[in-house]
Design a protein with these regions (language model features):
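Short, well-ordered amphipathic alpha-helical segments that serve as non-catalytic structural scaffolds
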Residues: 45, 49, 90-106, 162, ...
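Conserved beta-ketoacyl condensing-enzyme motif
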Residues: 43, 47-138, 273-289
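Acidic-glycine-rich active-site phosphate/pyrophosphate-binding loop
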Residues: 125-139, 177-188, 232-237, 289-303
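Claisen-condensing/thiolase-fold acyl-transfer catalytic domains that form or cleave C-C bonds
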Residues: 103, 121-123, 140-142, 147-168, ...
Length: 392
């Protein structure tokens, strides 16, 4: 019996920001060069992002000042320490809210969870959010805890691999995987094209999955990992003095287009990519989705869930692929339908998984028509995620 995602839960911060308003906020910065203004306009307008969520209310131009914006409306750049202090306060409510949502959707009692795997690359703290999940949701103190840190946008896949290994070793295991990313904590005004692109696409959010042995949901059939060696310097995530710094060269979409076919080939066997109707591709950006679709010869419908999540949430790093899977499942996938999930990370790393939709067992004379995995809308993580951050 294979490991199965029984349910997916999601959570977003309360503050929603429109792409046009955020673009104008950056354009209005007095020290932005003429070239930077052109790049800002092109990056924001071509992003295919309509809205994002953030733990920083001051990024909404209609809001008042905060740690990242002064009384005159100018963006300021707090130290990495100040940003991480904000993470310590603002990340735990998102971890807890998405985990609670997943457990409720799965109908899983918190005290039956045997393993917790947490994922994040946008902040560090110990004791970590894994303990917030344990304490606030009533998990057993003896639960096994594992954290995956700083692996970037593809980190949900190593987390699912670990969960599947736990379940394979113990069919009674109940694994809770929780990803939470506060990408906007690392926003800053800059003339650097990589930072401008990051400012235009990244948002905040959290997602969780309950993984067990068998049952209805999304069965995890196989995983594969591939590294594009020539892209080792084209995507990176580093720690600077004024926040974490994204390296995202213009070569990334091209490299992905050239290598994604070989990367997913082990999951397809003799089949063609287009034979899989649904692809849950991490929406790292519009160009990445376009190149993936073109390289694999997929119809536009195959990446519909990915484009919807990019439009409504932007790129939430490791949590995003769970949002895409939940969106795909809400579309009403038939039992037995294959799904391939795919994400890209620093290195340049390509992570993928082949899944199968498993329906509920028939009861009485009726027939099962769906799965238990991720059928609802995003959870508002509540006032805790809007907690004020002291100005540096």
């Amino acid at each position: 019996v294979s490991a199965t995602i029984r349910a997916i839960g999601t959570a977003v911060p309360r503050t929603s920001i429109g792409q046009g308003a955020v673009r104008d906020l950056f354009l209005d910065q007095a020290d932005a060069s003429r070239l930077a203004r052109r790049i800002i306009g092109a990056a924001f307008d071509g992003s295919a992002v309509d809205t994002r969520h953030t733990v920083l209310p001051e990024l909404d131009p209609a809001a008042g000042p905060g740690a990242f914006r002064d009384d005159a409306g100018a963006l300021v750049s707090p130290s990495t320490g100040t940003r991480n202090d904000a993470y310590r306060v603002l990340a735990p409510p998102l971890f807890v809210a998405s985990a609670r949502d997943a457990l409720e959707r799965a109908g899983t009692a918190p005290d039956t969870v045997t393993h917790v795997v947490t994922v994040s690359c946008t902040g560090f703290t110990q004791p970590g959010p894994d303990l917030d999940v344990v304490h606030q949701l009533g998990l057993r103190p003896s639960v096994f805890r594992q954290h995956i840190g700083f692996m970037g946008c593809c980190a949900a896949f190593p987390a699912l691999r670990i969960a599947a290994a736990f379940v394979d070793a113990d069919p009674d295991a109940v694994v809770l995987v929780v990803c939470a990313e506060l990408c906007t904590l690392h926003v800053r005004a800059s003339d650097d094209p990589d930072q401008i692109v990051s400012n235009s696409v990244f948002g905040d959010g959290a997602a969780a999955a309950v993984v067990t042995s068998g049952g209805p949901g999304l069965r995890l059939d196989a995983f594969t990992t591939s590294v594009v060696a020539e892209g080792v310097d084209d995507m990176a995530w580093n720690i600077g003095d004024e926040g974490f710094e994204m390296v995202l060269s213009t070569a990334v979409p091209k490299l992905i287009g050239e290598h994604v076919g070989r990367a997913v080939a082990p999951l397809l066997g003799e089949g063609r990519p287009a034979a899989v109707p649904t692809w849950a591709v991490h929406p790292g950006g519009r160009a990445i989705l376009d190149r993936t679709e073109e390289a694999l010869g997929l119809p536009p419908t195959a990446l519909a869930a990915s484009r919807a999540v990019l439009r409504d949430h932007g790129n939430m790093s490791s949590a995003t692929v769970f949002f895409v899977l939940a969106e795909a499942l809400r579309s009403g996938l038939r039992a037995g339908a294959p799904v391939i999930a795919l994400a890209f990370g620093p290195g340049l790393t390509v992570e993928a998984a082949r899944c199968t939709v498993v329906q509920r067992e028939p009861t009485g004379t009726g027939t099962g028509t769906g799965t238990d995995a991720g059928a609802g809308t995003d959870t508002d993580a509540g006032a805790g995620t809007d907690a004020a951050v002291g100005r540096p």
